[in-house]
Design a protein with these regions (language model features):
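Cyclophilin-like peptidyl-prolyl cis-trans isomerases
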Residues: 2-191
Length: 191
């Protein structure tokens, strides 16, 4: 299944458009070159953090996410779910936990995938297939979230983990809603 998602090429993206399994709207986006590091810089109203995309293990998910970043899809969104000591979740343009880009891609994570502090992965509903990814993502703030390997791994925080931890303290553990608005002012991709 993932063999069709690969591609050669040079630079930040291959010239080949995606052949990734998708559901929903028909979309195409360039595939990222797995030999080049790709970082997402996230500027929030509480500070900045960055994460490196795991193109090797999640070629379709990372390429789709990078395409959304380039389109400024995430700019102005909020972290709509904050569970102290567990995760922060964002990427929903409706801020309801039900929004997305109108399509999903699939990158089934390895059976040994771990969701430890700083790991960035894609959120999905319990009815969606393993590895389904739209636009909603979460960042683990616990030493180990204890989740099964069902969530496509997007990458890992490489800078600003203290900012992520600070955001992670601004949630209500019962309602899982933020106690303070945390907005993504801008996301940018560097390669």
């Amino acid at each position: 299944m993932l063999a069709g998602c690969g591609g050669g090429g040079h630079g930040t993206a291959t010239k080949t458009q995606n052949r990734c399994p998708t559901t929903g709207a028909h979309v195409t986006f360039p595939l990222l070159d797995p030999k080049t590091p790709h970082d997402v810089d996230v500027l929030t109203n509480l500070g900045e953090f960055a994460f490196r995309l795991d193109v090797q293990d999640s070629p379709c998910t990372t390429s789709s996410f990078a395409s959304l970043v380039r389109k400024h899809f995430f700019d102005g969104t909020i972290f709509h779910r904050i569970v102290p000591g567990f995760v922060i979740q964002g990427g929903d343009p409706t801020a309801t936990g039900r929004g997305g880009p109108g399509y999903t891609v699939i990158d089934v994570p390895p059976k040994n995938a771990l969701y430890t502090e700083g790991v960035v992965a894609m959120a999905k509903s319990s009815t969606e297939q393993r590895g389904s990814a739209g636009s909603q993502f979460f960042i683990v703030t616990a030493p180990d979230a204890g989740l099964p390997p069902d969530y496509a791994v997007l990458g890992v925080v490489t800078k600003g983990l203290k900012v992520v931890e600070r955001i992670g303290r601004l949630g209500n553990k019962v309602t899982e809603r933020p106690t303070r608005r945390v907005a993504v002012l801008r996301m940018t991709l560097t390669s």
